[in-house]
Structures are given as C-alpha cells and as structure tokens.
Amino acid sequence: MIYRISHTTTYDYTDSISLSHHLLRLSPRNLPHQRCLHHEVHIDPQPAIAERHVDYFGNAVTFLTIEGAHKKLVVKSESNVSLMPPAVPASAETPAWENVRESGRGRQMGHSLEGSEFVFDSPLVRTTDDFAAYAAPSFPKNRPILEAALDLTKRIHADFKFDPKATTLATPLEEVFKNRRGVCQDFAQFEIACFRSLGLPARYVSGYLETDPPPGKPRFVGADASHAWVSFYCHGIGWIDVDPTNNVLPGTRHIAVAYGRDYNDVTPIRGVILGAGEHTLKVAVDVVEMKEPAKAGAAKSVPKRPSS
C-alpha cells in the first residue's frame, strides 16, 4: 500500500516574532516493511538556515532558523510512503517475558544492547510500583512476551477512555492512571511505563494512522491526526509494535516517523522564538491511500515556500 501524507502546522502570533529556531521530525522512517518514497517540507516564511541531520535515535531532523519579523509560521510536510505487512511472530514463538528481562540484565547482553537503554526512566515516563502492579496480571510466570503484551494492550484499551480534553502535554502519567482518560500519547507512555516497571525495554513511536470515515459519511481533509504507539524489544526477534489506543498490532495503516524514549524525543515541531505575546496553533493531518503507484526515488527533505 502507498500513502500520501500531508501534515500542516500553522502558528499565528499576536505580536511580531523577530527570530525563531525550530527542529522538525516529520520525515517517515525507512524500515524493513516501510519505505519513504518522497518527502519535502514547505516553510513560510522562507528560512534563512535549513539543515538536516539524523539524531541519536536515527530520526531525520530538520533544523530551521527564521529571520525577519513575522506574525505567522506555516510548516507543511508532504510524504509518500510504501507499506508492507510487518513481520510479526506467532505469540507462542516468542520467549517468556522473564527471559527477555534477564537477557537485558546479564553480561551476555550483546544483541540486547539495542533495547537495554529503553528500560530506564525518561523525562515523561517514570517507573513505579503502581504501574508494575497494573501490568502484573498480564505477565504471569513463563507467559510468552507477545501474548503478555497483547493482553496488556487489550486491558489498557478497555480500562482507559479516549478524551482529548482530559490531558495536556504536561499531564503526569500518575494522573492519567488515576483518571483513566487521555489520548494516544498518554496511553502509549502509560504502556511504556508498565513495560519498564517490569524491567522490560519499550520505546515511544510517533507517526500517522490512516483512518476510514464512517459508512456513508464523506472523508474530511484533516480528519486524521498524528498518532503514537509502543514498541517493545524482544531478544532474538527485535522490536514488536502494539497500539493501546486501538488495541491492534500495527500493520499497513500505521506509518512510523520517529522513535524515542517518550514524546519529548519525537516532538514533530519544537523551537524557541524571540518575541512577546501569545500564539495559536492549528494542525491538520491528512493520510490518503494512493491508487496509482508513486514514482520511487530517494526521499528528500527540502524546505520550500508554499505556492498558495
């Protein structure tokens, strides 16, 4: 399957901004089952500096500097991505979760080094006894780790209610756990906290989810949104993704953009500005399946001025 993704972010400032610096993490990753065929970013006003690099976690990052007075900033990311079904083992073929935990603790780590750094606390995800206790019923002795992960994912989906008004980016996980409400970011970070509280490595995945309109209803541009899910590490197999918001194993409708310890590592756009006043933020994400194959080529990330 091939998708066209449009992600437009608009900042409107009440007062003029004289200088701003921004980091963008908007380019879909290249993975065994996912290929970014094309990517470009349109910026208005035109940046004085636009440089691209790869961060510690392997995410494509674009650094921007906007000079000159401006009261609006528009960042439009456009991508074409090809997806195949990811290879996921049968639950019974995965090792017992205790073996995964011990593989990251022993001196024989070797191949487990990739996951070991995702066992520890991070700025937005803290391990606690309460989180471990919540996860425990899904992780009885000798249960295959994928079977346990799917059960935990199912329970979070059932126990927590999707409520965009319940949390902000600053809401602590303890409050999310207490109220059992939030959005995909909260559910992903809570499940990561559960894994890590049991000594299991897990990371945050940001990306997009293709969603279908209700039967008989038109598809609205911007109806889709950026999405978040979880990836846990299993020695001998690698990373396996689960989506607690939708209670699914991510497949050909999940498009990965960035990996990190938590949301702080994968923020789509962040930056600093020189100026006073307030600002409003508008975000529109559109994910459309393409009926005709897109022309394959090297993915690029080139800042451009919008034509409209």
Residue ranges with predicted function:
Residues 13, 81, 234, 287-289:
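Short beta-strand segments enriched in hydrophobic/aromatic residues
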Residues 297-308:
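Acidic, low-complexity intrinsically disordered tails
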Residues 154, 186-277:
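Hydrophobic/aromatic-rich core segments of domains that either
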Residues 1-133, 137, 142:
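Linear, non-domain "peripheral" regions
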Residues 13, 53, 93, 158, ...:
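Glycine-rich, flexible loop/turn motifs
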Residues 24-28, 32-34, 39-42, 246-267, ...:
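Glycine-rich, small/acidic residue-mixed loop/short-helix segments
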Residues 5-7, 20, 37, 60, ...:
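A generic structural signal for well-ordered coil/turn residues at beta-strand boundaries
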Residues 96-182, 190, 261-263, 278, ...:
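Secondary-structure boundary elements
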